[in-house]
Amino acid sequence: MFHWMLNEAKNRNLSPEGYEGGLLIDEMTIQQDIQFSKKGGTLKLIGFKDFTEESKHMNILMNHKKNVCLATHVLQFLFLGTTGFRFPFTYFSTTGASASELYLVFWKAVNYLAMFGFSVTFLSMDGEQSNRDFMNILLAHTGSGTFTIDNIYDPKRSKISIIMDFSHVMKKIRNNISKSGKNKYDKRNLTHKENKIYWEHWRNAYLWDISTNPFPIHQKLTLEHFF
């Protein structure tokens, strides 16, 4: 896979800057299923959890037995270069990757990419609990307030910055704002100079925009966004 990735980069005449970029980690829910895969006359069952060898050994030690279970998620690693080169180079069938599993796979990915001339300068993922725990493991001994870590395989190169996926962050902010209000059970309210901002303010501003304002500002918003 990494040979294919390198050949794609060469075929596109990628500039040296294009070999630097970030890792995008995303885990998606899938429907549990078992299927046959035929390759070279050999049949193989696919659909089971298939993670790293370290993960398999850890599960055996924790459960005192070897378990075989259907995968419920697919974990994908994608390289995004600074010049726009995108390449999903590996994926795993999981039942929901833990923080420790993500930690092991992340550094393996960084190492393999470096072996083929690609340098990781940032890590991007959504705000799932396992991802936040993984981030805490990475930052545990750095004391960094900038969310950066050293590349353990090449400390002389640029640090690796950890960022949360923008779309997921904005969605989380939106969901929290939608739950804000003046009721006693509304505990999450945005504040600006000690003034609280409620969901009602956003809704009323939109209603004024579509009913009174002769030149509506938020033309892409609809009632479904608020009700």
Regions found by a protein language model. Give the residues of each.
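Intrinsically disordered, low-complexity regulatory regions enriched in Ser/Pro/Gly/Thr
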Residues: 14-17, 68-73, 81-84, 114-117, ...
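Non-catalytic regulatory appendages
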Residues: 66, 89-227
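Marks the mature luminal ectodomains of secretory-pathway proteins
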Residues: 48, 81-82, 141
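Generic structural motif recognizing short loop/turn segments at the entrances and edges of beta-strands
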Residues: 18-21, 41-42, 73-75, 85-88, ...
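Structured nucleic-acid-interacting core domains from mobile-element enzymes and related host factors
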Residues: 1-77
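Short, conserved catalytic/metal-binding motifs centered on acidic residues
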Residues: 22-29, 79, 123-128, 168
